[in-house]
Amino acid sequence: LLSCLVFYRNHKSRTYETGIKGVLQAFDLASSRTNWQLCQIICVPMVLFLAELCKMPRAMWAGIAAMSAIVPLMADMQARVKNRIIGNVAGVLCFLVLYTLLPTSIYAYIGILGGIGVGFSAKYGWQAVFNTFGALAIAEKLYGLKGAVGLRVAQNVFGVVFALLFCAAFYWVMERVTGRRTAGEQNI
């Protein structure tokens, strides 16, 4: 509720020139922006559906990983996928070191430390490292240390790899349908 109030206060005096009609007119299957948006809205629910169908706990991790990896250009997406996987593995290793060295009374603060780290991280790879702390701090209590670590890595790898493959196929199909090269197809 507080976020809504702050958003309203900061935006109430802005004039928006684009109405629903303008949004609908801007929809163009040959546009790289439209393709990127369609890829997001189709891929993320598919990842969640498949993770749930496979009875993977914490399916939202796969969905969030996919959502964060999907960017308009494939070259950028490939870098994000790589950074997400490396960042998660590094985050797991850092978490394991902290978990081993710190007393149990401090475990709850590992997640908070991760949140602070995400806030101060300018690079996506480092955000993935610190984001892992909070996720594992919660999941460890539910699944045990080994289960939480395995689940975190598996869900993230599944989410970003599926998103990469899906978007590559999606952009390829959209190029064939529209007859125009999409921005997403570059560098694949």
At which residue positions do the language-model features occur?
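Alpha-helical transmembrane segments and their membrane-interface boundaries
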Residues: L1-F130, A137-I188
